[in-house]
């Protein structure tokens, strides 16, 4: 199964959050500029949005977080997060520890999340990755479902 890319935007007039197919071969600046001409501004996934997205997919789609990348390179931090993610596979309660750590990093250390990778174990399952710039890629057969879910969470967090 192949993955399909999407990009999240916000309508400037209605403030609604919407998704559009995205071709990673396209010039990113051109895509954002073209959307702007059509009345949209890009949505950025702040750490608070990313945390809400992770939580939604953990709870609603029986998912596991396979990787979290940060905007800064910190090997010690990466190792600590990797260990928590490993523990989460066997014990979902570690989500609270991870959530607290991610919130703290963002709020007090200005360390933001760059990318999150998730694997859903529900139904046929799917792979999903979400980036700070509002781009996501997901297994093709669940693109609309997951894209709608992402928009709903973004809408809720930024409201």
Briefly describe each language-model feature range.
Residues 1-159:
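Intrinsically disordered, low-complexity, charge-rich terminal extensions
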């Amino acid at each position: 199964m192949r993955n399909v890319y999407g990009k999240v935007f916000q309508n400037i007039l209605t403030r609604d959050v919407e998704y559009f197919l995205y071709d990673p071969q396209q010039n990113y600046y051109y895509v954002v500029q073209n959307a702007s001409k059509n009345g949209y501004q890009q949505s950025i996934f702040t750490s608070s949005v990313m945390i809400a997205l992770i939580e939604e997919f953990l709870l609603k789609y029986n998912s596991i977080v396979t990787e979290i990348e940060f905007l800064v390179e910190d090997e010690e931090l990466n190792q600590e997060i990797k260990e928590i993610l490993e523990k989460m596979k066997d014990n979902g309660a570690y989500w609270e520890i991870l959530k607290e750590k991610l919130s703290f990093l963002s709020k007090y250390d200005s360390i933001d999340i760059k990318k999150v990778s998730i694997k859903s174990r529900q139904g046929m399952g799917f792979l999903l990755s979400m980036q700070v710039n509002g781009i996501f890629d997901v297994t093709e057969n669940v693109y609309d479902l997951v894209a709608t879910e992402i928009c709903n969470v973004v809408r809720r967090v930024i409201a």
